[in-house]
């Protein structure tokens, strides 16, 4: 295996782990102590290199901490879809992909392609095109001059 493919594969596996951790937090509920215990159990049951674990935790922590920036972007890009009505895995893939687009450490095309692959692997048949469309919309919003406003802060339209 080439070095580039090995790095790519390691980053892909880190994204899978981060998605699983986000799912544990989202579906498991509970407080911070329960989430921390679930994360410790996850790592005890799933071996990973220190680099993969670091990247997975960075994606998990970054996504979790930036939801106030992430969710308005997804809501704006996913016209006619409310976050709470999206399939859980789709919502989590979109959140993590949006975080990566905001962070900018990976090329946009790679982030969107990885999100599509996660949707194909862990969600329904219609998920990949949905994730592709929404993240492309997020990409356009981020490239535009004015980012979307959080819900409820829109200025009234002129009459």
Residue ranges of model-derived segments:
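N-terminal interaction/assembly modules
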Residues: 1-159
